[in-house]
């Protein structure tokens, strides 16, 4: 590639990953500018949101690198295309993954369009730990080489045409090396802690955030044997596989194993629990997925053996996937999997290549 006069707009978050991404692209000879996105307005004060500090750090890094930093507010787009869906899913008792939707609709849609249409960018870049590789004329998504930081799970909705306009400078690095590069360059973000929490919303307590927008409906907690144990504060506050903050004290029911959420009966507003992390009620043989996205934008038409992740940081699970009616996908696991959660994403891989994924609609219980 002839990189002379190729402009790259780097999404600057104020963290070390985006800082080093900008540095590496500069060293490769690209014309680099930064862009800081503000995507949240509510509760915008110091206790919850670090946006002012993040902006200051992003500006400081850009000053150190001698590049322009653009600032843009995408709060309305985030609300319409991410947060409303996030709330709607919780209202029906599901557990969504807003980071995936944020990548799809904000970082690799709104940001990409703004950078190319308004700032004259040839490419955008982010600090994601993934690799883009061109195969048979299409850009493909590969796992980052650092297994502990690989973020391909969150990018399965991004198509090959968008991927072709994106750089991921950290894909072949591990986090320790990224911090070493930042420290050697004297970047102010070299030792800054990684951000946590919901995409762009920061460290707000999830239960507090939900309670501001959704009216909780308390109900009964029962065991898998229909024994009443206590009360829950609202099904939206709980997810499958959860063991902490169930509010049932030391109740053991004759066993020393801890309690886990194994199901939610939405129609009767019941939280169902059982003891043991491998209780049969918590396990699934497979799932049905919808809202399917394939990186190469070719719809799957025949069964395929591959691997799947049903949550981030999960080891790959061998599976057979096959298309079924209503643009859905049936996924049959090679072995039972715990806490498959409707609303989360099932993401598919062929070796190191992330080929796509979908939203988990139904989990298939053991014996089905």
Curated annotation (Swiss-Prot):
Entry keyword set: ATP-binding, Cytoplasm, Disulfide bond, Nucleotide-binding, RNA-binding, Transferase, tRNA processing, tRNA-binding
Q: In which broad location class does this protein mainly occur, judging by the first location in its UniProt entry?
A: cytoplasm
Keyword RNA-binding carried by entry:
yes
Q: Which residues bind ATP?
A: 11-18, 37, 127
Gene Ontology biological process terms, A to Z = tRNA wobble position uridine thiolation
* Residues of the active site: 102, 199
Report the subcellular localization. Cytoplasm
Query: Region labeled Interaction with target base in tRNA — which residues?
Result: 97-99
Q: Which PANTHER family match?
A: MITOCHONDRIAL TRNA-SPECIFIC 2-THIOURIDYLASE 1, TRNA 5-METHYLAMINOMETHYL-2-THIOURIDYLATE -METHYLTRANSFERASE
Q: Which family does it belong to?
A: Belongs to the MnmA/TRMU family.
Protein's UniProt name: tRNA-specific 2-thiouridylase MnmA
């Amino acid at each position: 590639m002839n990189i002379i006069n190729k402009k790259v707009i780097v999404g600057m978050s104020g963290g070390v990953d985006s800082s080093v991404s900008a540095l590496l692209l500069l060293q490769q000879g690209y014309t680099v500018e930064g862009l800081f996105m503000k995507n949240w307005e509510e509760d915008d004060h110091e206790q919850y949101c670090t946006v002012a500090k993040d902006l200051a750090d992003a500006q400081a890094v850009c000053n150190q690198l001698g590049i322009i930093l653009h600032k843009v507010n995408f709060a309305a787009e985030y609300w319409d295309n991410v947060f409303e869906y996030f709330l709607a899913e919780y209202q029906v008792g599901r557990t969504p993954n807003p980071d995936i939707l944020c990548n799809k609709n904000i970082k690799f849609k709104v940001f990409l369009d703004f950078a190319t249409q308004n700032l004259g960018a040839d490419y955008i870049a982010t600090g994601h730990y993934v690799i883009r590789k061109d195969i048979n004329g299409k850009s493909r998504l590969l796992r980052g080489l650092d297994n502990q930081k690989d973020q391909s799970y969150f990018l399965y909705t991004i198509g090959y045409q968008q991927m072709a306009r994106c750089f991921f400078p950290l894909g072949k690095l591990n986090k320790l090396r990224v911090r070493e590069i930042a420290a050697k360059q004297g970047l102010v973000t070299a030792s800054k802690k990684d951000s946590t929490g919901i995409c762009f919303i920061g460290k707000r307590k999830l239960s507090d955030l939900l309670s501001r927008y959704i009216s909780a409906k308390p109900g009964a907690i029962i065991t898998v044997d229909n024994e009443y144990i206590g009360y829950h504060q609202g099904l939206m506050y709980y997810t499958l596989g959860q063991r902490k903050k169930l509010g049932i004290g030391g109740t053991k029911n004759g066993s020393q194993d801890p309690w886990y959420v194994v199901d939610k009966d939405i129609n009767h507003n019941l939280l169902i629990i059982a003891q043991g992390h491998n209780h049969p009620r918590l396990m699934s043989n497979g799932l049905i997925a919808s809202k399917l996205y394939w990186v190469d934008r070719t719809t799957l038409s025949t069964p395929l053996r591959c691997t799947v992740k049903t949550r981030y940081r999960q080891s790959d699970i061998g599976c057979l996937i096959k298309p079924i009616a209503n643009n859905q996908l049936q996924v049959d696991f090679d072995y039972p999997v715990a806490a498959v959660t409707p609303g989360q994403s099932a993401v598919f891989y062929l070796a190191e290549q992330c080929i796509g994924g979908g939203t988990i609609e139904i989990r298939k219980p053991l014996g089905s």
